[in-house]
Amino acid sequence: MSSRPVRVGIVDSGINPRDRQVVAVEGGVGIRFRDGRVERDSSWEDLLGHGTAVAATIRGHAPAASLFSIRVFHRRLEAHMEAVLDAIDWGVEQRLDLLNLSLGCTNREKEAAFVSACARAMDLGVTVVSAAGTSVESSFIAVAADSELEGEEIRFEPGLLRASPWARPRGVLPREKNFHGTSLAVAHVTGIAARLLSRGERSLREALSRMSSGR
């Protein structure tokens, strides 16, 4: 089966399209919640570096993927939930295949809206890969970090995938000095999922669980 370009949206601090590991970005959007309303603009490039590290890690697993920057982090790695929900909607509008949400949601008051938005996206054909929240949900592929895992390794648990917390190696920079943690674990799973989709895989959850290093 011939491969097809997989469209991946990265909800984060933006992406630097000139980064040598990222190679290219198809486009994107900047999203803010300000003065009680959501605003969209063209400011999707990264000023913080986090989203670029995520994009580079995804690119390492899926070199042919089409990457889209959905910037919700601006001056710091924080975002209003309304901006995150709109980011998910934007991914649906653009008919993306995958949405990478390294941020997740640990606020129980806002979690219901987040889970609902993810479920809607999944129903409309956009697979959401996100940091695990406060409960196990089937509305997205939930990911947590495991420092014992490396690169392609995945560990399957009921309702949860564990992956490496380390970013794609960058020259002589020690990995502990680069961004690391659950955000990068999510990126590893998203990148592997993109590669599986490009090969025609239809059931991502099953395919990812089969890759589990514990099986």
For the regions a protein language model found, what residue spans apply to each?
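Active-site core segment of subtilase-fold serine proteases
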Residues: 1-61, 65, 86, 170
